[in-house]
Each structure stands twice: as C-alpha cells, then as structure tokens.
Regions:
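C-di-GMP signaling machinery
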Residues: 97-98, 122-156
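Alpha-helical scaffold within the catalytic cores of cyclic-nucleotide enzymes
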Residues: 26-38, 59-80, 104, 109
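Catalytic-site or vestigial catalytic-site microsegments of nucleotide-handling domains
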Residues: 1-10, 163, 168
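Conserved long alpha-helical elements within nucleotide-processing catalytic cores of c-di-GMP signaling
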Residues: 5-31, 43, 58-62, 139
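Pre-Walker A (Motif I) flank of P-loop NTPase domains
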Residues: 159-161
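Short helix/loop segment flanking the catalytic signature motif in cyclic-nucleotide metabolism enzymes
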Residues: 22, 50-68, 99
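A short glycine-enriched loop-to-beta-strand structural element that forms part of the catalytic core
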Residues: 40-52, 77-105, 116-123
C-alpha cells in the first residue's frame, strides 16, 4: 500500500493545475515502478494506492533501498517543496487478506514515524524501514492520533510482556 503523504499541504500551496500535475506525476512514478517489478498499481482513494508484485521483486527493491522514494522526492512543488510517499509492504503472509492487513499495519507504522519512507512487515512480526530522509512535518490531528493509538494498542495486545519505563531507565 502506498500513500501520497503531503498531498494536502502541496495542494494548499499551489494552483489547481499545479496540484493536478504533481498528483499525476506521483501516480506515474508509482505506476512505472510497479510495472518495472512485474506488478501493477490501482488507485484506491485520495492519495492511496494498491501495488501488487511478487517476492523476488520486493527483495530487489529492498536491496536498492526503495529508490522509488528518491524519484518521488524529485517531483517539486515550487522551488523548495517535494512530494513524498509512504509505503507499507507485507512479506511472507499466508493469504492475500493477511498480506493486506500486514501492509496496512506497515503503512501506519511508516506514517507514524513521520512518513516519506517504506516499512516492510515480515513473517516474524518484525519491521524493516527504508527512507525517511526528508524532514517530516508532524501532523497533530485527531485521525493521526487515533491511528497511532490503535497501532500501539495492537502491539501491546500481541505482546506477552510489556514494560513501560521512562527515558532515564531505558
């Protein structure tokens, strides 16, 4: 799953035609990337995309450190602002339903860490992260807070042992 992180911010700061150009370029880069991996892309809703490919191409993308993030950052709005995406990847799931759930969790994790990165959730319930080079703009809204709280709650429920401590003792 892929999410166009800063679409609203870029749209707010640009004209309608500029916004359409940026959104189109982001979708084009993602489409070409999916096709280069023998997969395909489908737009889901406002800035969200489903990308399907096979394991060998995911491994190759990981080896290249998901260079698609760099290509997306090359899409500029004005002189200083770049487009960014976050991607959630599932590896080793037993079914398509499980893969979708894992990809959603991975995407939430990438967004929770500031966006502009890829989070890969693997079979042993570990995550691997790529990207995150641009300075993330912290969004403090109710939806984001709820997503982070739900993700944290899921991790606590799935854990056998939970330790909570302050920074001084960690």
């Amino acid at each position: 799953l892929a999410h166009f992180d800063n679409r609203e911010e870029l749209a707010r700061d640009s004209s309608g035609s500029e916004d359409a150009r940026i959104a189109s370029e982001v979708e084009q880069v993602l489409t070409e990337w999916a096709q280069s991996m023998g997969g395909f892309l489908r737009r889901l809703s406002g800035g969200r995309f489903l990308i399907l490919t096979d394991e060998i191409h995911i491994r190759q993308a990981m080896e290249k450190r998901f260079e698609v993030l760099d290509k997306i950052r090359e899409i500029k709005a004005g002189e200083r602002r770049s487009a960014t995406v976050s991607i959630g990847v599932a590896r080793g799931a037993e079914s398509l339903q499980e893969a979708e759930q894992w990809a959603r969790k991975a995407l939430e994790m990438a967004l929770g860490r500031g966006g502009d990165q890829v989070a890969v959730k693997q079979k042993n319930d570990t995550y691997e992260f790529f990207g995150g080079l641009s300075k993330g703009v912290e969004k403090r809204d109710k939806v984001r807070t709820r997503v982070i709280a739900a993700t944290l709650s899921d991790h606590i429920k799935e854990s056998e042992n939970v330790l909570i401590m302050g920074h001084r003792f960690s």
